[in-house]
A protein has these predicted regions:
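Inter-helical turn/loop segments and adjacent helix faces that build the functional surface
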Residues: 220, 224
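N-terminal leader/presequence regions that precede the main folded/catalytic core
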Residues: 1-108
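Extended, well-ordered protein cores
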Residues: 80-212
Length: 224
């Protein structure tokens, strides 16, 4: 008896594996060479700026500020506000609108609105933490400068990559609803609920990705 083919596991972080499932990609991508990939993302100007941040003697810290627990509380407030928006109820597309030319449009708009909120909130928070880090010590001021260069260099790439997530979710939406096209209303509602759960899961995973630099800055702020 012939064995059923098994899908090769997709390597990488949970967010990447989730997106691969939405794409229904049966191949396991080769892990990229991170250093080679970063080299293509840095133009000469960025590379020189980063080199200066790493090589120049750090400037004296202005006031030697210590870690303030309010920074933790600020991060928690920002995260909680974004989580509340992600978990807010999403109105499913009405059955009468399911035959519209683009029934996925409300979900796309919702996801993109959440992305904009996350980008604004995490960007502002990252800047505030970096300013505080720069005031703690000369070494931490250098770290803050490096983080600023990395954000300026990588954020446009990150924005471009994350902008493709709604399109992958659209493929997932179409696949789910094509499979339920001949089902009854209850089965269709179940399919919609499953999709909305996956949409929230994607937003939660993206939020974690966006908070990685913030968590790194917080850890640096706590270090004496």
């Amino acid at each position: 008896m012939a064995k059923a083919s098994q899908r090769a596991p997709v390597l990488g972080p949970a967010f990447i594996r989730l997106l691969a499932r939405f794409k229904d990609d049966a191949t396991s991508p080769t892990a990229p060479d991170v250093s080679a990939r970063l080299a293509t993302w840095f133009d000469w100007n960025r590379a020189i700026t980063l080199s200066r941040a790493l090589d120049n003697p750090p400037a004296p810290a202005p006031d030697g500020a210590t870690f303030d627990p309010d920074h933790d509380a600020d991060c928690t407030r920002v995260r909680d506000r974004l989580l509340q928006a992600i978990h807010a109820e999403i109105a499913p597309v009405a059955p009468a609108d399911a035959a519209a030319p683009d029934p996925y449009a409300p979900y796309r708009q919702h996801y993109q609105a959440q992305q904009r909120a996350m980008q604004t909130a995490t960007g502002n928070l990252r800047g505030r933490l970096r300013d505080m880090l720069a005031r703690q010590s000369p070494a931490k001021a250098r770290l803050a400068e490096v983080d600023a260069v990395m954000e300026a260099t990588l954020s446009p790439r990150e924005h471009t990559l994350l902008s493709h997530v709604p399109a992958l979710l659209c493929l997932h939406y179409q696949r789910l609803h094509d499979s339920a096209a001949s089902a009854d209303a209850q089965a269709s509602a179940t399919t919609t609920a499953l999709f909305l759960q996956d949409l929230r899961t994607a937003l939660l995973a993206e939020l974690e990705v966006r908070f990685h630099p913030i968590e790194g800055l917080l850890a640096a702020l706590r270090t004496r």
